[in-house]
Amino acid sequence: MSEAKVRDVSRHTVPRQSTGNQARSAGATHPGFKREQNEDALWSDEQRGVWVVADGLGGHQAGEIASKTVVEEIQRSAATDRHYEHALQRAHALLLGDEQSAANMGSTAVVVAEEGAYFHIYWVGDSRAYLWSPGEGHGRLKQLTNDHSYVQMLVDSGAINPQEAASHPNRHVITRCIGGSTNPSLDVDRMSSPWQAGDRLLLCSDGLSAEVEPQAIAEILSCNDDCRRAADLLIAAALDAGGKDNITVQVIDAPDPARLSGSDYMGADTPSPARLGNTARIVLAVVTAAALASGFAGWLLGLIPH
């Protein structure tokens, strides 16, 4: 499907926000061909350096409400304390407090927050952040987030490999989300990294990552300098692959090199450059392996389908 055809189909492109300099980010979302509603949500504020993608689940407008709740809490935090981990936890509490949500109203989320020459990523579920860096061929595309999903737990435990995970029948089952459970606590994974000149971040729902191969994503990001065009072509690629789910993307370019060279600030409330939460993931892998060995895998299959 062509970029122009994508723009003709009912979907929303987020206007790139700028404060005088050329905008360096753009987002787009599309319901796909198989879903009546678009339960994804996205928001960005380039001036404040915040971007979010949320993928709602639950059906019958429940997912739409959940993803909107996530976005609203990120907006609130961007305008006040900039504590995005707390914002996701507030959204979790709000959804648990909704009488309709205890059973199945939930959302994934991936958030990017910029602090000087660094960016920080917060995520829950299987919405992803990728880092594209220039290089030979179509550059290098690296997945920065680790899915909170059943198949990722199997990969971490060594039960299956990533290739098997891509076609696993339970690849859409997630093990952590905002809302969607009766657990009052929510663990938010975080990582941080310095921007490098020429870098480009991609946030997306699984409507893109489950349909389009990383090589194709890297080619689109490398061949299209304009963020809006890149976002539209990513949507088009997912639609060409079948458009079986809602599709949402945000493309974010690194700040101007002059800004990078003049800033080394990291906020006091932001995590260290190393990804946090390794211990928790190791424990999860051990627990998963034990569950598989003990015949409790069926319990995991009862987790939220995505």
Placement of each model-derived feature along the sequence:
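PP2C/PPM-type serine/threonine phosphatase catalytic domain
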Residues: M1-H306
